[in-house]
Regions:
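Bacterial N-terminal signal peptides that target proteins for export
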Residues: 1-7
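N-terminal signal peptide c-region/cleavage motif recognized by signal peptidases
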Residues: 16-18
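Local sequence-structure signature of Cys/Sec-based thiol-disulfide redox active-site neighborhoods
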Residues: 21-47
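Second-shell loop/turn segments in exported
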Residues: 29-31, 50, 82-87
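Amphipathic alpha-helical interface surfaces
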Residues: 40, 60, 92-96
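Conserved helix-turn-beta segment immediately C-terminal to the redox Cys motif
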Residues: 41-60
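Structural motif
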Residues: 60-66
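Thiol/selenol-based redox catalytic cores and closely related redox-interacting motifs
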Residues: 66-151
Length: 151
């Protein structure tokens, strides 16, 4: 009896959180004309996650970022929310999944600017060196993942 109760609770715990069940639900704010944003959305969908998009003009998108706590130094072309976190720019899905597994107290992750070779910004095999940063609740950041240049 105890083992079946434990098994039922374990299954419930795994299905209660989207981060643990494997299928996440992203809301992405972007401009209508941004091709790299659309490519990043496809990167997320290819990993099996659900994505809803909202097209905004640049001014509304900038205000949306500010409202979510994204400062100019962390900004990129699109802003997503997933399971209580903000994902700014071309952040790889593996970094997002690690964030949701570890659940640090933070606003979210950012790939500041538009790093060449990041998801949605592919340029053949080339990738510029760049960092994905954890944006903390106080607005500061620290390196979450570093990506070396690749030719």
């Amino acid at each position: 009896m105890k083992s079946s109760l434990f098994a039922a609770l374990a299954i419930l715990a795994m299905t209660a959180s989207p981060a643990l069940s494997g299928k996440l639900s992203f809301d992405v704010a972007k401009t209508a004309s941004c091709g790299c944003c659309k490519a990043w959305v496809e990167h997320i969908r290819a990993a099996g996650h659900k994505v809803e998009t909202s097209d905004m003009d640049m001014g509304s998108l900038a205000q949306h970022k500010i409202k979510l706590g994204i400062k100019p130094q962390h900004a990129s072309c699109h802003t997503a929310t997933v399971d209580g976190y903000v994902i700014e720019g071309h952040v790889p899905v593996a970094d997002i999944e690690r964030l949701l597994k570890l659940r640090p107290e933070a606003i979210g992750l950012s790939a500041p600017g538009m790093p060449a070779g990041s998801p949605g910004m592919e340029m053949g095999t080339y990738r510029e060196a760049h960092d994905v940063v954890l944006v903390k609740l106080d607005g500061t950041s620290e390196v979450w993942s570093h990506y070396e240049e690749k030719q």
